[in-house]
Amino acid sequence: MKQYFNPILPLDEYIPDGEPHVFGVRIYLFGSHDKEGGTRYCEEDNYVGWSAPLDNPGEWRYEGEIYSSKQDPAYKEGAANDLYAPDVVQGDDGRYYLYYGFAGTSGHNCLNVAVCDTPVGCYEYLGFVRNPDGSVHKTYLMGDPAVINDEGTIRLYMGWSLSMVAADAHKQGAGYADGCRRAETDRSGTV
């Protein structure tokens, strides 16, 4: 009998807050990265990726590190540079966008975006999620983003805050290459 394992909580990795996505013929899992014996959540300083073929979802493969907190410009040596639960979306340009919350004792608390040409390659910092006036959106506790590509409109929703709509955030010449803009929403979170 073949042994299968759970990529969310295997014996040597702790990947809570999992966000599974199907890209091509594989399912990819993105999530936070807890430290064994840690004293708080998200203590590891990076994100790692996992994937499995759609026709054999028990065959999970560890893809390695896909992003490090040291790549974020708000990173501070010696501070708690926590990378909270991320999510990934494929833009209409074919690239993959990693939305993540970055916080901790570094004093930084906002959502950021990194970009990559493959789902689990090496993501590169792209920018902050911004308000319509261009200021960095950090009014609320930033965490647990969920992103979808809704027929070309990148929609961003997050826990602990008001929902966002990242319309045309990833198109060339959109006027801002550093994340997305907050849409005005009513109390139910709809635009």
Region annotations inferred by a language model:
Residues M1-V191:
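Carbohydrate-active catalytic/glycan-binding domains of CAZyme proteins
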